[in-house]
Amino acid sequence: MIRVTVLSYLPEHIEYASQHIVSALLNDKKILICGNGRSATTAQLFSLAMLNQFERDRPSLPAINLAADIATITAIANDYQFDDIFSKQLRALGQSGDILLIYNDGNNPANIAKVIASAHEKEITVIAITGNENGLISPLLQETDIEIRVSLNSSIRIQDQNPESSDFPPSNLRTRKAEE
């Protein structure tokens, strides 16, 4: 597993993660994204950048924000439990070779742990963008997964440093897929 903790090295590791995303997209796979609270908003920004043009006109790219549909989230939470809100969707929508992109600002939510386990069951690579030094996520990741750890103490500061503001999705993802 690749793990990064120094902010100055984030761009090259974001590039590494983007190569996995590009590879999945070029193989007709999709990106599933999730996060809780403010991280759900960051997940939505990534999804928008993929589905709609980002800085220039180009074809839409397949991305599903698992945190976006409040009716689905509340139905799953009501009928099952809150811990299942992402994993249940991933089990229905995810396929081997897809990417699960997780934004987590430092909390240790059980719903994130469950979606990681579900991703591994379906052979979906996890890219986790985290902000917690001793969190729950890191031990759950496999060798094929990628963790980009933004080592900041404040969840607001972590949101400020999210990859959307650091050219994520990177230019090569936007250019390479548009050329297909």
Task: Cite the ranges covered by each PLM segment.
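Short glycine/proline- and acidic residue-enriched helix-loop micro-motifs
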Residues: 1-5
